């Protein structure tokens, strides 16, 4: 049994009820500026010129990676460890690293004044649904989603479908 030292009772209850937990400021600031510093160069676009934004969203490949425990702030990492039941539950090399494989959502003019309900959203998927899962398969215990910038209303954030999470 895990002895909770970092998750508050409210966070524990929220995770059990909803199947997810928001941890603000979860990214170690040491990685924000260096990783975001060359983002627009990698994209081949200019942040100050929307005419160069040629796609609504792009997925960039990973160029750099660090162990999750370095990438996360200590608060975020210790809460992650408690959620999964202890550090011994993490495979020594699979699922241990996070990198700069950004998914960038540029949006378009339409979304400035239009809302989209979850049922209208495209791209619904189940993570790791492209291979047969086993109890010791990677990526099945907990998915970490990091936001590198604020996500304003209509800003293209990730929907989480609680009804699809068993027990959620």
Language model segments and positions:
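Non-heme Fe(II) oxygenase catalytic core, chiefly the N-lobe of the double-stranded beta-helix
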Residues: 7-10, 15-18, 27-168
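Eukaryotic N-terminal targeting leaders
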Residues: 1-2
């Amino acid at each position: 049994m895990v002895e909770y030292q970092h998750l508050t009772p409210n966070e524990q209850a929220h995770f059990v009820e909803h199947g997810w937990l928001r941890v603000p400021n979860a990214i170690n600031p040491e990685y924000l500026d260096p990783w975001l510093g060359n983002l627009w160069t990698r994209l081949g676009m200019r942040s100050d010129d929307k005419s160069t934004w040629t796609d609504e969203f792009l997925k960039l490949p990973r160029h750099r990676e660090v162990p999750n425990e370095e990438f996360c702030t200590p608060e975020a990492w210790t809460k992650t460890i408690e959620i999964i039941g202890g550090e011994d539950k993490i495979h020594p090399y699979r699922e241990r690293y996070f990198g700069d494989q950004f998914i960038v959502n540029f949006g378009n003019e339409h979304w400035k004044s239009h809302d989209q309900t979850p049922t209208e959203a495209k791209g619904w998927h189940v993570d790791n649904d492209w291979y047969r899962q086993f109890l010791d398969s990677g990526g099945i215990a907990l998915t970490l989603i990091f936001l590198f910038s604020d996500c304003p209303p209509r800003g293209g954030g990730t929907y989480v479908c609680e009804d699809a999470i068993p027990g959620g």
